[in-house]
């Protein structure tokens, strides 16, 4: 299998180090495809290697990195495309491990653990509070601290901070199936491509060892942090539920809609007192599913119809009980900060953003021992579902909670 390592560069300062890490590969059937977009010269030692192909292609000044990488990949001849930034390093067994893993698993996308290193030799070690695990790693006589990547589950795939990091490799078939890099993206292009790769049904495999060392520079992120945050939020908002639904399908987990007699989305089983897929009294008899057997519980315009106090606590405990580890509660409830919570005479419990603290924060839960559920608050926000709701000041609180049942979760865990 020919492996195409692709590298766009506007600054070849560290290319010699990159080249040395390629020369040291235990797997020898590779090509290095460099897309050169700078006046600075690439060292002759690199250009002189027959396995290196350099393309000097004028790129429009306003072209995004997505367009540049898509062009770079189009120039590759191999069956496996490996992303390699122009200032980073590969471990000697990187390409061999990728090829071996692809042949053994049939993966279309692979990623590994990684090291973030600085010029002074120190490492950027991510905070364990956000779910990160680290371990010691030695490379070329130097000691580093490696970061363990997260599994490809909805909690990690929906945030750039936890999504698959380097090394990242696509089979050419998987890359094309996903549509390649988005040419309109000037940043966050890799995250957006990873999400689309997953949604294309490509098999993901995490390789739990370090194959890549990422060089961090001063202000690597700080100058772009706001842009990154905003763009990743756009990607998340667009794809989050598609990712969750596909994860359920892959794991044969049903999706249920509580109080779903009306408005039940395709793919969900509705549960309600009557005229539903499952006719059942949820408040009286609980949720008619076994423990840890459900992928998503949808509760749109439902929680406010559960009596306050013990019944609401029991319902949240029930939702947690039936959710599989990593399963999602997707909820939408009229907020007390608008008129909707109180205007309907059938509403008998009242909710706002703070209400979900008791099910996702130890600080509040400790005062209500009857609450047994342990949720991670993935997203909680307030908005108007439609202009009509806005006109009539009917504000809703949305809460996406993830069932924490001992599995490794990305993001803060307060409970």
Q: Where does each model-flagged region fall?
A:
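Conserved donor NDP-sugar-binding/catalytic core segment of glycosyltransferases
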Residues: 95-137
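Short aromatic/hydrophobic "clamp" motif used to bind/position activated sugar donors
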Residues: 81
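A recurrent flexible, glycine/aromatic-enriched loop bordering the glycosyltransferase active site
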Residues: 66, 134-170, 279-280
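Acidic donor-binding loop at a coil-to-helix junction in glycosyltransferase catalytic cores
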Residues: 187-193
